[in-house]
Amino acid sequence: MAEIIHHSNVFTWAFHVSEYDGAPLLLLGSFSSVASVSLKRSGDLLLFERFTLPARTRSVALLSSHFLQSESGRHSIANILIATENGKCYLLQLVKTPEKAFPTIRIRDEFVLDTRMYNHEQLGKSIDLCPNASLWATNSFAGDIVFFFSHHPSLSKQVFAQLSIDGIILHTIFVPPKRSSSSCVTYVCLFLDSNSNPRINVYRWSKTETFSDASSYITFSIPVPSEFSLASHIIPCSNIPDHFLVLLETKICLLSVPQIECGDLKFLQTDLPCSGSHNYPLSIANDNETPNCCYLTYENGDLYRIRYSILSIDINLIGKTGSSLGNLILPCYPYIVFCGDCSDTLVYDVSVSPMSFFGSLIACAPMWDFVYSSSRHNTLLDEDINCNTVYATAGIGKSGCLVTMRYGCSSTTLLEAILTEGAVLSGIINSNHNSEFYAWLTYPWQTQILRLHLDGVVEDVTESLFLDDIKALYVINYQNTFIIITGKSIYAVTPSCTKYNLLEVSGDEEFVLAAYNELIFIVKKDLMNFKSQLLTLKLNTLSNGTLELQSLPDSFDLHDVPTCITSFSLERKLLVILVHPSPYFECVFYDETSHSSVYKVPLTGFQFGYLPHSISYLRKSNRAVYVLISSNSTLLTVYVTLTLEGVPDFKVYSNPISTDLPLTLQSPSDEFSTIYAWSDYLYIVGIDMETEQPTLNQILEVNDSFTCVSGIYDIPNKFQNSESRIIVYYSNNTLYLSELWLPQRTFSSKLNLAATPKRLLVDKYTNTLIIGCCHVLVNEITTSGLAFYDLTNSRLFPVNWPSMDIKGKPIFKPEELLYSMSFWIVADDQKRKYRYLCIGTGVRKNGLTTGRLLILTMNKDHDSNAIELRNVITINMKDPIYSVCSIGKHGLCYATGRKIGVKMLDLDSKKFCNSDCELPVRSPIVSMSTYKDYVYTSSLRDSVAVFQYDSENNSLNLVCSDTSSRLGIDCFYISQKKLLFSCDKDRLLTCFKVEGEVCTSTREQMLQPILTTVSQTKTNALTNHLKYSVIRVDKDNHNIVWGLMGCTLDGNIFKILMPNDPTSSDTIIYSDT
């Protein structure tokens, strides 16, 4: 299936849907996904969830939150109506469920809006909601308008009215009516008639309660000035009935419906301010906080506030952002959100003057290329994809940049205390005070107890608890009195630091394990015969305020000494689980009458490579619990339920994990999820409420804070909040109190290049990222250039245009455009390898475009820490060189104009030795890769074509090509599966089975997709690069699953995994981007 690794942050629509925990909650949407975002944290936009849409979005509308009744236990925050290009309407619902801390996005309903799929004339061009009636409307470019009822409990297709306009619809809105005619519905449409003249039609219904009211409407139509055809936005005036604003390139106009009814063309209008040359208004939106007020943005980032009335329109500048803004603005006081148009999502605080920057989500679009520096031979391990940083190029001209993206979550350190080396955090102890709790640390020689205050104060209370040189098995805070369980005794310490003993054992016995859950459970070991016994103790408070231990009559002799213990309740019945070194565990069950019974459960089929060392549990309900048992590389899960007869039932299964080190489990503070870690691995175990199965998720922290972790715990629930998880952990001799911001998401940073970065290469020898750029401006003349990024130190080398070689000569000519860039690896007979940097360009001069093939050597001067380039060979050609790659041991394949050719290098003379080897092709090849002597290409007329190089005859021959003529973008061949993937301008991702020799028959040369119906499905975004093989190793079945990586023009990076059977119905997988 397709999985998006890094989502695009190019949002084309946005809504302020609610307030969540005192902060604005937004829904941001792209063509392919929806994200819920909170603005609570200063300097960061907290992204809760991503939801991938079934098809590409065409239009959206925000419905009222009471549009659908909330289900039991679920609180509906917002409902979004989305029309997609597959002809369907989807109702997306943002709901808050008791099981999850964050709002969840889901599809609530759907129906077919138009059977004309993937057609620009289908309905769904825009969606308008009626403010005073239960109606919504949608339209098409072809002039169709359909009105639907919206007061039904589900999105059934119930049409109120249908209209048809002879022309092209540009903009439509519902206009709020006067209070005296609140049942009246007014609909305004700006369109171009059959003669391309702009007109405005007004449709008015006196009432819209039943189907019979649909035909009882009146309509008015007026011609408007031709400049109205350039209107970018139309917005209703919510506080001025029967009025709306029209935004033009140089003017803003206030129109009234009664004026249109009278045919009056003298609209109230005013000229827009001149905001610099070649800067035009981008977006306009109503200010919901201030009546008769809206915001206006310009391309250069200027922000204006417009106040309007039926008499005047006033425009005032309120701020300059200093950066290019998107074409969408969303006011949500005190913030304003800017997004869209391949721009970053920017948030500014307008409650202060001048307005201040709040936070951003970096948009890596348009994305041209991406690389993983950790790849080996163009292959990635699936388990390493999320753990590594990806580098991508994006932007055009001055906005060009290098973007680094990493998947994970962020953390904020609230407190840190440097301690003695060698501790393990063994637990968190609650306190009766509201602002403090205790951390329990275990050293090989003693136990240490620290009191932690939320204001940052750390206090060592070990000495007051009489723990000097004593190692505790368990520590309990019972009614502000500490109960300390050691190997030889149990004693209590009062708040006044008075100590008294509760229980002691004889010299040939010792306590080895303890647990507490209403009762104290202790495993006592006999040192003489190595037998053990489970004791059950109850705490009682005496009249003088002291405590005593009451030993319950039930004590159990155990078969051997267990290694870990835990206790929990099921419907007020206590259960104690003890895990033994042999593959079995024992469960002591206490019913309501305190009668106890013992169950011995064998772990058949499971072998502990190492001793089971930690145990915890997750609660599913009052009658079901998941018990987690940790051993080396294995997490055993025991599902414990109560039967109808009230006795426990057990089911056992395992989850292998990816670390060889032991894991420490905590007793979960909320009993629904637990966090655990060891060394550099951090995990969260929870319960998936839909599948009712435990989920094991590795948490990646982008700040690399969690290294050498030995013990991690949640702080008590009373200090937690819904947006984050506050944890305590011990790492590198330091105790940290940190706030972990979940869920995980992509974190991006941007380095500006002031050019268009089109190609990326990773040089393993110098550990450098090579960035091939176009549109480099040197002395007011555009050319190309090279930039370099140091992967070792994570910094960009100083960029100096124009790019020079080691002799100080410019590498690129004026008006030279970089098209392709590749490494050429040449191997000689002694298996020595030489590496060259090959660049294909196009040079425009005197109205003609020629091409150059540049072959360079690249080295790193370690003294000056600079990259040195030397021009070795330059080949001039009649046409631009669109693609270049290596073939064979010392061959170079290139595509120039409508030809593909191969040149072979003589290693002795360092010159090309073969005669001309070129083959005409139908159209220019835009992408090319090789495997052995085969060349896989994408061209402007063929999504894929395969050629073979015959070294004996020095000739290229066509092997096969696509059956249909499609404008190809890129292709990628997975040799292990003999599968060739292609992407094209129709947004198709197609897979072909490629195996065979050169065919003489034209029909035999045609490639057939494996599954035509599936491969012809459109993807949500344009895939423009296919890159990297992906290997997933199934450790259970010892199977290897292959896949590939790809990216889309709007900034998504995705992976595709294929089943082992290439002829199965799941072989063709397309990106749901």
Curated annotation (Swiss-Prot):
Task: State a GO cellular component annotated for this protein.
Answer: nucleolus
Cysteine pairs forming cystine bridges in this chain are none
List of residues binding ATP: 392-399
One Pfam family cited in the UniProt record for this chain: CPSF_A
Residues linked to a glycan: 132, 544, 632, 703, 732, 953
Q: Which domain of life is it from?
A: Eukaryota
Q: Which residues constitute the signal peptide according to the record?
A: 1-36
Keywords of the record, alphabetical order, are: ATP-binding, Glycoprotein, Nucleotide-binding, Signal
Q: Which GO terms describe its molecular function?
A: ATP binding; nucleic acid binding
Is Glycoprotein among the key words of this record? yes
Tagged with keyword ATP-binding: yes
GO biological process terms, semicolon-separated: nonfunctional rRNA decay; recombinational repair; replication fork processing
Protein name (database record): Uncharacterized protein C3H8.05c
